[in-house]
């Protein structure tokens, strides 16, 4: 088995600072914070401290935060929780598959639903949206890293921050937002739902109490996510520079490559399509040289399938690989990857 020296895959191991404390978190976080006994009271104190830590990092109030044990459930809660019978729903052709599913469900129920198109940079083209409508707004795309300008319509907004995380917080008003713990090297299975307009939001799930969410998240994983976030924010960030180095190398050294990622997008994501090679063969060949990359859609339900994001942008789909540049990446690893990529492409093209 070849040792992976450069891991550019989107999935990431838990931040080492959180990993080292996992046993402690599970020893402290097992009680139910809602109960009255001493151990539960201690757990409740920990939970509140974590809530305030997240509130500061995400630039929200503590009472606007809901923790989720299933991040994908947050899309349904954030979107359907704002909808009333007379709202129109607008989403974009580059949104996540979970958004597509909610939009299709609402359309099947008879709601007026519109899919907004994007240009070749992946920027959403707003059209005919009023203040009474709900607009789903992806802060940054999880494949290309391309970011959106602030929405102009004045509609209610659900901000999808699952890819952007704390690397780019919304600079516009929104009613709900969703974050994924994995975006800052936290544990999987933890989402953070923000409900800023509580008066406009109603729990769309079957329920018989005033709880806004199921509350089935793991407190130990919540503690781990908070530590991961704190350490993630403290790390130096050289990713934009490394991304530009890769783009510059490819542009100068490898022909017939379409780079879908804008240079001014998030530094952590890069999507390229290379003419004359099969993506899966390129992925496996790079792995043989010690480099792991992704291919296909970033949406879990469509892994290794052609990217609907690139198709919506009018970009080539064949020969596409995706890189996630992590904070611990070094210039040396990037240089070695570029050399390996050039060699693999030449090999697969038969040059």
What do the PLM-derived regions correspond to, one by one?
Residues 1-351:
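Pyridoxal 5′-phosphate
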């Amino acid at each position: 088995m070849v040792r992976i020296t450069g891991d550019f895959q989107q999935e990431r191991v838990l931040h080492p600072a959180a990993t080292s404390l996992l046993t402690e978190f599970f020893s402290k976080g097992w009680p139910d914070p809602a109960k009255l006994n001493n151990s539960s009271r201690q757990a409740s104190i920990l939970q509140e401290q974590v809530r305030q830590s997240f509130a500061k990092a995400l630039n929200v109030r503590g009472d606007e935060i809901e923790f989720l044990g299933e991040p994908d459930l947050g899309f349904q809660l954030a979107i359907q929780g704002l909808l009333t019978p007379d709202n129109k729903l607008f989403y974009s052709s580059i949104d996540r598959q979970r958004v597509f599913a909610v939009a299709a469900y609402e359309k099947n129920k008879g709601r007026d639903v519109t899919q907004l198109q994007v240009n070749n940079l992946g920027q959403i083209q707003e059209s005919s949206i009023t203040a009474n409508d709900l607009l789903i707004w992806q802060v940054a795309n999880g494949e290309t890293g391309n970011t959106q300008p602030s929405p102009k319509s004045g509609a209610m907004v659900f901000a999808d921050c699952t890819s952007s995380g704390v690397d780019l917080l919304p600079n516009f008003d929104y009613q709900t937002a969703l974050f994924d713990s994995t975006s800052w090297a936290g544990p999987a299975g933890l989402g953070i739902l923000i409900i800023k307009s509580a008066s406009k939001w109603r729990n769309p799930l079957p329920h018989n109490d005033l709880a806004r969410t199921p509350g089935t998240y793991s407190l130990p994983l919540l503690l781990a996510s908070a530590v991961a976030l704190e350490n993630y924010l403290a790390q130096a960030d050289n990713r934009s520079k490394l991304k530009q180095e890769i783009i510059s190398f490819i542009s100068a050294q490898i022909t017939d490559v379409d780079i879908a990622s804008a240079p001014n997008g998030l530094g952590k994501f890069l999507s390229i399509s290379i003419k004359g090679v099969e993506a899966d063969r390129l992925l496996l060949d790079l792995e043989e040289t010690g480099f792991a990359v992704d291919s296909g859609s970033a949406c879990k339900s469509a892994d290794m399938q052609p990217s609907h994001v690139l198709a919506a942008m009018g970009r080539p789909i064949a020969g596409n690989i995706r890189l996630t540049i992590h904070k611990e990446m070094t210039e040396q690893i990037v240089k070695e990857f570029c050399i390996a990529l050039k060699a693999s492409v030449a090999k697969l093209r038969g040059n």
